């Protein structure tokens, strides 16, 4: 096995593009990505705006609670989220891929900081 082959070829790329389901894989990835990005943009902007500009009871505590969820490793939440998706009957659906990622604490924090900097 060599690190750099003498005669490089694009044959593997051609084989992948000829595969029947490859376009479906790309479409699935695109669909999930667009839904998650749009959901994050909409919901995180609303939550970030509320934390930045509105006054309500428990604002600091709630924001600290949201930020503290960023300290929980993703590996710890994978099995409980899977069990929840199984209870909902969402296994092998787009909902199971998109709903858990629609709002993320990092995006809430990022958009809160952005809205606070607006005049």
Positions of predicted regions on the chain:
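A structural signal for multi-pass alpha-helical bundles of membrane permease subunits
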Residues: 1-119
């Amino acid at each position: 096995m060599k690190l750099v082959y003498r005669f490089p070829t694009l044959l593997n790329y051609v084989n992948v593009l000829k595969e029947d389901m490859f376009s479906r894989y790309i479409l699935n990835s695109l669909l999930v990505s667009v839904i998650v990005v749009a959901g994050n943009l909409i919901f995180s902007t609303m939550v970030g705006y509320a934390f930045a500009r509105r006054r309500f009871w428990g604002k600091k505590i709630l924001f600290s609670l949201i930020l503290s969820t960023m300290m929980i490793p993703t590996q710890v939440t994978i099995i409980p989220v899977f069990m929840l998706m199984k209870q909902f009957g969402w296994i092998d659906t787009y909902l199971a891929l998109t709903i858990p990622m629609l709002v993320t604490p990092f995006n809430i924090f990022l958009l809160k900081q952005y809205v606070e900097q607006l005049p």
